[in-house]
Amino acid sequence: MTKLEVCCYSVDCAQIAEKAGADRVELCCGQSEGGVTPSVGALMQARETVTIPVHPIVRPRGGDFCYSSNDFTIMKNDIARIRDLGFAGVVVGVLDTDGHIDMPRMREIMSVSGSLAVTFHRAFDMCQNPMIALKQLAELNVARILTSGQQQNAELGLALLKDLVAATKDQGPIIMAGAGVRLTNMQKFIDAGIRELHSSAGRTVPSTMRYRKAGVTMCADSDVDEFSHYCVDGEVVEAMKSLLVMGSPLAKHT
């Protein structure tokens, strides 16, 4: 059966995702930057309170995936901490200046990761040649690749996603579709034979604050609504999981 990974930007969201039936959580912070490394406190709380597999992202900043020596050292330190805390896996990716997989650095990351299941994240979608990148990641023995098929969303990238699935049919990383995967379009990914789906399955939640100071913001973008935040919608996760169960070959014959 196709698995559902839910992208969570807080431990609260991870707990909601688990309760709603998610198979796995990708734990991040910094939604506006596309996900960056969660704090040590968040990692510890997730480890203590979430029982399904949690894969924290290790990404020291937003933007591109070509990192300074300090950034890279920080990444290795974060991965070591995640490994030592006993997480099931980690989500990471590093490119070189020409848009290829940075193989020397990725080999170091794989070594530091130890028994962690490594997901190579959507840095894959920024690679020059996806099929060469796939071969390199297979050589590294990463567990899976999170990708939109090198498009702005995974539905637009279905053609490449199908090619990647075909190329890894017998061996290689699991291809996990992500970016714009929703209840309304997920059947397309199931029909394409994609084994894992990644979704934020969320909604905007208003702040509980009654007093709201006017004219002062913490964000550089003063148009951002700071009295709301994005959170996983448990009902959406439940509905997505139900569709996956009904869409599985076993369910169709029972």
Curated annotation (Swiss-Prot):
Cited Pfam families: CutC
Keyword field contains Kinase: no
GO CC term (a single one): cytoplasm
GO MF, one example: copper ion binding
Keywords: Cytoplasm
InterPro entries with a match to the protein in the record: CutC-like, CutC-like_dom_sf
Compartment(s): Cytoplasm
Superkingdom per UniProt: Bacteria
Stated family: Belongs to the CutC family.
Database matches in PANTHER family: COPPER HOMEOSTASIS PROTEIN CUTC (PTHR12598), COPPER HOMEOSTASIS PROTEIN CUTC HOMOLOG (PTHR12598:SF0)
NCBIfam families named among the record's database cross-references: PRK11572.1
Protein's recorded name: PF03932 family protein CutC
Gene source species: Yersinia pestis
